[in-house]
Every structure is written in structure tokens, then in C-alpha cells.
UniProtKB/Swiss-Prot annotation:
Pathway, per record: Protein biosynthesis; polypeptide chain elongation
Source organism (scientific name): Helicobacter pylori (strain J99 / ATCC 700824)
Entry similarity comment: Belongs to the elongation factor P family.
Domain of life: Bacteria
GO biological process: peptide biosynthetic process
Record keyword Protein biosynthesis present: yes
Keywords: Cytoplasm, Elongation factor, Protein biosynthesis
Function: Involved in peptide bond synthesis. Stimulates efficient translation and peptide-bond synthesis on native or reconstituted 70S ribosomes in vitro. Probably functions indirectly by altering the affinity of the ribosome for aminoacyl-tRNA, thus increasing their reactivity as acceptors for peptidyl transferase.
Protein's name according to its UniProt entry: Elongation factor P
Gene3D superfamilies: 2.30.30.30, Nucleic acid-binding proteins
Protein's cellular compartments: Cytoplasm
Amino acid sequence: MAIGMSELKKGLKIELGGVPYRIVEYQHVKPGKGAAFVRAKIKSFLDGKVIEKTFHAGDKCEEPNLVEKTMQYLYHDGDTYQFMDIESYEQIALNDSQVGEASKWMLDGMQVQVLLHNDKAISVDVPQVVALKIVETAPNFKGDTSSASKKPATLETGAVVQVPFHVLEGETIKVNTETEEYLEKVK
């Protein structure tokens, strides 16, 4: 199905030249003279590169043949990540470039969304909020009560996030995986 210029928005998936892209950023421009156009930054699902593309009135792009499947992350071995389809129990292996930034939020057994393009896995999406245990952070000191102050904390997946001073090593916290921000302690 063709997608018109007026339908473009952030997060929309499109296909150009047989390559699937996600719109990362877009701006609708109405110049004083001439027709309006959309300037967009689009990210390739295949290689992760971001390019800038201009769409003019009347331009159309195709909706990619993408399927999202819920899969279970099993384990990481070298530069490959193993996943299992929770419906068919079929296992697939993805490399570092296909998993990308999602790897720093994935725990063994976690359910993730794997994106397939023409039946080939191309990317992994983790939940927007994950609960992870802090394995290393600086201890608290008397007087560290300013709510605006933060300290780095290493999570069980190896990711490092900034947390308030009252958060201690060994505690489990919720983190927004898109902004990489601390949300709250898990009770």
C-alpha cells in the first residue's frame, strides 16, 4: 500500500528502493514560494544508517513487508544472540548489528519484539520500561539528599544509567529504554 507525504510521521515504517526504514525525525516545510514538502531523517533497519530525505507533494513510498513477532531472548554467545519464537519454538540467531542498542537492556528469558522483513529478522525492540538490578554504584554519604544530584549505576546487563543518590547497590530499578533514564525503584 502506498503512503502519501501527508501521512508521514515519527516512528512510521516505510520502504524505499526495497530497503525498510523508520522515520526518526520529520519536519513539514511550507516555503513562501512553491509547494510544501517534508524533510525527514530516516533510519535503515538493515544497516542502522540514518539519512536525510526530502519528500515533495505527490511523492509516495511503500509500506514495507514487516512482521513483528514476540520472541524470548535466550542467551548471548560471542557476537550472536539467540532468540526463540514463543509460538513455534523455532530458534534464530541475530548478530550485534541486528540487535543494536537493545542488547544493553536484555536479560536471559526476556520477551522482546523481533522485526522480520520478508521473513528475515532485521531488528529487536525491547519493552519501553524494564526492571533491572544495580550491580555497582557509589555508596551514599551523609548529606547526599539533593534530589537533583545523580550518580552513575551499572546494571546487571552492563548498561550504565544515572540514578539519585538514595538508590543503593543491589536494588532493582525501572529504566526507560528509549531515554535511558531512571524512573523509580521496584518495591
